[in-house]
């Protein structure tokens, strides 16, 4: 009995020891993601089945999340973990790059530079900017360790030589034609949804490729022309996000296939100099997101890459590092008719549309609103000026006076004996002012209305809320009264009394 209890305790102890050392079972790798603020980093990262909600990490200067990699769909324990560090993209935050890419993790790290393909006129400028920032940062890391930097450069050169084009293509293309979809359905694969596609890439059987035993780059054959002339010692992947924008560019800006080919070949030339891979992705249309994750696993963990190079579909370009050469680019470059001069600046061919310039100019002219109290104060002063001008200006003549003036002018022309307007009128029961007010009762009201409005805005400006409310209620409750209106009422009462006496 005692021996059985000891065996059970040993079993539980073994389980606890294994769980405590669980972190030692898988390797960890890091990915630093760089790019402009709206280049599509977060959406691309959200397709990698990360632990954190990537959308909630937006507008954070340096965000972090990770995803675990499993050997197959039946595995419970991960075989690897990828740590993703995403820099928001503001120039003032470049110093934070030291937390995601430093001397401790640079040997097991790769860099992804995201570009916004919906604005192709900014692609080269943005790519060169981030490559310059990355180069300056890496050189600052190894400023006192030249040998360490040389070892990383040799390692990247060896990785370039080791690339081999896959012999079979996995069903990881996110957007395919109808015929391809039928073929995929026959093979019981469904690449139509990105979530399924990403999980297939993560949970498929992982197979490590045979890595060459070469450790010295000097024994390898020399690289071809323009390859790795700017060797930073770190694997780089240039991801052109929002590649589904080709439809918008064709429709709104009249982009042709030849111009897309020119853009692709120009980017390939830059990637060749840094030994970088190139891929077009779209998180919204689920294009090449799974291929991107598969490529990351191949670079960091050495897992087999089953996706072939893609140069046919203009929104699904994929050129892995190690496949391209300057000769291949030149062959494709000669077939396009946009520009034959390789030294022509990119900005002269892919020009920024003028409509975008006007839109940016209107956005820069920001409108600053006045403070509420200042705004109400301006209205009050304007009302006060209107009241003052109405008092100083002569009153508008009534229709009666205008008609009498017309009669007077006509009588003067005809030299008749009819008295002019200056002739005294016969006495009546009502004064002329009362007649005017009775015929046009609104004549005296504008000043009263302005006074009410002035009181209203004065109450809003007042700091004392209680007193302002009382003034507002009193100004709105009591209608404007004048001495003219009271005289009119008395005259009306007298007329009624006269009528009553006549009936008697």
UniProtKB/Swiss-Prot annotation:
Residues 167-195, 383-446, 464-504 are annotated as: Disordered. One of its GO terms (molecular function) is dynein heavy chain binding. Belongs to the dynein light intermediate chain family. This is Cytoplasmic dynein 1 light intermediate chain 1. ATP binds at residues 35-42. Residues 167-189, 392-425, 437-446 have a biased composition (Low complexity). Acts as one of several non-catalytic accessory components of the cytoplasmic dynein 1 complex that are thought to be involved in linking dynein to cargos and to adapter proteins that regulate dynein function. Cytoplasmic dynein 1 acts as a motor for the intracellular retrograde motility of vesicles and organelles along microtubules. May play a role in binding dynein to membranous organelles or chromosomes. Pfam families: DLIC. Its main location: cytoplasm. One of its GO terms (biological process) is microtubule cytoskeleton organization. It comes from Dictyostelium discoideum.
């Amino acid at each position: 009995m005692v021996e059985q209890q000891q065996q059970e305790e040993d079993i539980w102890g073994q389980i606890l020891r294994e769980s405590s050392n669980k972190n030692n079972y898988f390797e960890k790798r890091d990915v630093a993601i760089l790019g402009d603020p709206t280049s599509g980093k977060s959406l691309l990262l959200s397709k990698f089945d990360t632990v954190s909600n990537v959308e909630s990490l937006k507008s954070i200067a340096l965000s972090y999340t990770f995803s675990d990699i499993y050997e197959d769909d039946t595995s419970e324990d991960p075989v690897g973990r990828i740590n993703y560090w995403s820099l928001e993209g503001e120039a003032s935050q470049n110093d934070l790059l030291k937390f995601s890419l430093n001397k401790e993790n640079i040997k097991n790290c790769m860099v992804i530079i995201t570009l916004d393909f919906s604005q192709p006129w900014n692609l080269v400028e943005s790519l060169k900017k981030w490559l310059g920032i990355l180069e300056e940062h890496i050189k600052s890391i190894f400023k006192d360790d030249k040998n360490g930097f040389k070892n990383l450069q040799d390692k990247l050169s060896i990785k370039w030589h080791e690339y081999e084009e896959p012999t079979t293509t996995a069903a990881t293309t996110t957007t395919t034609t109808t015929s391809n979809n039928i073929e995929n359905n026959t093979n019981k694969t469904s690449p139509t949804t990105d979530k399924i596609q990403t999980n297939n890439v993560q949970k498929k059987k992982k197979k490590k490729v045979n890595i060459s035993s070469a450790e010295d780059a000097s024994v390898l054959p020399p690289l071809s022309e323009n390859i790795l002339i700017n060797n930073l010692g770190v694997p780089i992947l240039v991801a052109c996000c929002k590649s589904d924008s080709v439809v918008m560019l064709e429709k709104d800006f009249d982009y042709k296939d030849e111009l897309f080919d020119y853009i692709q070949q120009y980017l390939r030339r830059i990637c060749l100099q840094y030994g970088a891979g190139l891929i077009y992705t779209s998180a919204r249309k689920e294009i090449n997101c799974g291929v991107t994750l598969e490529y990351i696993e191949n670079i960091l963990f050495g897992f087999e890459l089953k996706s072939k190079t893609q140069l046919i579909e203009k929104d699904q370009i994929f050129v892995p590092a190690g496949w391209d050469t300057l000769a291949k680019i030149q062959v494709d470059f000669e077939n396009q008719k946009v520009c034959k001069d390789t030294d022509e600046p990119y900005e002269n061919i892919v020009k920024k549309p003028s409509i975008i310039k006007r839109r940016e100019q209107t956005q820069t002219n920001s409108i600053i609103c006045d403070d509420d109290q200042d705004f109400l104060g301006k209205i009050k002063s304007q009302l006060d000026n209107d009241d003052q001008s109405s008092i100083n200006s002569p009153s508008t003549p009534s229709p009666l006076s205008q008609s009498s003036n017309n009669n007077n002018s006509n009588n003067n022309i005809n030299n008749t004996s009819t008295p002019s307007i200056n002739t005294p009128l016969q006495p009546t029961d009502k004064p002329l002012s009362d007649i005017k007010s009775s015929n046009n009762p609104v004549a005296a009201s504008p000043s009263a209305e302005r006074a009410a409005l002035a009181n209203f805005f004065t109450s809003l400006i007042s700091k004392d809320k209680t007193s302002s409310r009382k003034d507002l209620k009193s100004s709105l409750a009591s209608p404007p009264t004048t001495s003219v209106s009271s005289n009119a009422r008395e005259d009306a009462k007298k007329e009624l009394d006269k009528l009553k006496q006549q009936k008697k």
